[in-house]
C-alpha cells in the first residue's frame, strides 16, 4: 500500500480543482447515461449504474440531474460513447492510465497524446502500463459508520480482500468479480457508501522529486480537465510540501 494516501490526495485534488462544478457533473452524467444504456435503468438491478449514482451523490449532484441522465439513456442517447483506456508514461517514467468515454475517438486520442507529449512523456499501446496496476473494487465509508473491528468483520464476512481504516474513513477492497456483491452486503449493513467503484490500484509507487512531481501534477490536471476523461490513475508519490504548494 506504499504511497496509497498520496495517490488518494492526487485523486481528491482533481475534484477540488475542477474549474466548474458543471464540468464534473457533466462527466458524472455521461457515466450514468452510458451505464443505464448498457444495462437496466434501475440502479438496484444495475451495479454499474448504482456505482455511478453513488459517485454523483457523493459530489452533491442534484437528484434532477441524475434522473435526467438516466432518462437520456431511455431516449436513445449514450450508444455513441466508446469506452477507451489510454496508457502511457508521464515525466520521470511514471505509469499513467486514463479512462475515457468519448463520442469522437480521433479527437480524444489526439488530445490525450498531445498532453503526454507536452509534459515530456509518451502515450503507449493498451497494456503498456496496466500490468503495473491491479484492477480492484473499492468501497469507502465515513469513519463514523462503525468501529475498525466492526467494519473489518463485516468486510471479511462479505468476501472482501482487504480493509484499511484510518482518520479519513474505511476503505474496503474486493476483486472485480466479487465487488458488486461485497458492496451490496456492506451497504445493507452500514448504509450507502461514499464511493463504490472499480479502480486501478498501483502495485508499487515511485517517489519523484519536486520538479518532476510538479510536471506530473500539471499533466494530471490537463487530463482531468478534458471533457472525455473520466478517471486518471498514476503510480507516483510526491512530497506533502509540493502537494500543499500545488493546492492539494
UniProtKB/Swiss-Prot annotation:
Q: Keyword set for this entry?
A: Cytoplasm, DNA-binding, Transcription, Transcription regulation
Q: Where is the major localization of this protein? A: cytoplasm
- Pfam families membership: TACO1_YebC_N, Transcrip_reg
Look up the record and give one Gene Ontology term from the biological process aspect. Answer: regulation of DNA-templated transcription
**Gene Ontology molecular functions:** DNA binding
Annotated localization: Cytoplasm
Q: List the disulfide bonds.
A: none
Q: Does the keyword DNA-binding apply?
A: yes
* Gene Ontology CC annotations of this record: cytosol
Q: Which InterPro entries match?
A: Integrase-like_N, TACO1_YebC-like_2nd/3rd_dom, TACO1_YebC_N, Transcrip_reg_TACO1-like, Transcrip_reg_TACO1-like_dom3, YebC-like
Q: Which NCBIfam families match?
A: PRK00110.1, PRK12378.1, YebC/PmpR family DNA-binding transcriptional regulator
Concerning its family, UniProt says:
Belongs to the TACO1 family.
Q: What is this protein called?
A: Probable transcriptional regulatory protein BBta_6910
Q: Which classification does the entry list for the species?
A: Bacteria, Pseudomonadati, Pseudomonadota, Alphaproteobacteria, Hyphomicrobiales
